[in-house]
Amino acid sequence: VEDKHLGGICLNWGCIPTKAMLRSAEVFLLMKRAGEFGLTAEKINYDLSSVISRSRKVAKQLSQGVDYLMKKNKVRTFMGEAVLTAPDIVEVRTARDKELIKARNIILATGARARELPGLEADGDLVWTYRHALQPKRMPKKLLVIGSGAIGIEFASFYNTLGAETTVVEVVSRILPLEDAEVSDFARKQFVKQGMDILEKALVEKLDRKKGLVTAHIKQNG
């Protein structure tokens, strides 16, 4: 049972589309370094809408691939919502009707959504969630990324490479805190070398929004 797109968050709104965006940024960076490879390239630029369109296309193709595999392996698929009405009964609600399914084993794979942080609520214009960052209407001149987990760092790298003045704020003592310390240290050095600002042991306390701009109040320890 799936309410939107087969493949869930990772395939449609997470690691797959971000990797497609990062690939575009990587090629853009390589083109800017063409001279290092004995090549000549002039007026190198990017079209943000085309970059995003490619990313969404990649996600869509893979989602359709999952749909194909479901049909090939004769897995019955419902596009709708599921509600547990008993320990062994699921009520499936689709656009057309409702159906009860009884099963001994039920797997809850609910996916994820962006958590609303008090005082930092997203509006899709000045303050984004990951979904807004995957479908930007314009390229920001400055970008503050709160959190340096995998997806936060991916967005920071993408927008920094394409020219946004990017700052990353991480509440603990190092970026990519779930990775090995050596990996975090190496990544930090590379990102700083690329012009990214990184604030560790830092907390965004509140945002002031006025006249199309956001001012972040950041408290940093150490």
Where are these predicted regions, by residue range?
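Glycine-rich flavin
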Residues: 2-139, 167, 172-176, 180-183, ...
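Glycine-rich Rossmann-fold phosphate-binding loop(s) that bind the pyrophosphate
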Residues: 3-4, 146-149
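Short loop/turn elements that form and flank the Walker-type P-loop nucleotide-binding site
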Residues: 139-140, 162
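Hydrophobic Val/Ile/Leu positions in short beta-strands of Rossmann-like dinucleotide-binding domains
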Residues: 144-145, 168
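N-terminal Rossmann-fold NAD(P) dinucleotide-binding loop
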Residues: 152-153
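Gly/Ala-rich phosphate-binding loop of Rossmann-like dinucleotide-binding domains
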Residues: 156, 160-161
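Rossmann-fold dehydrogenase core element
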Residues: 165, 191, 198-200
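Phosphate/pyrophosphate-binding betaalpha-module
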Residues: 203
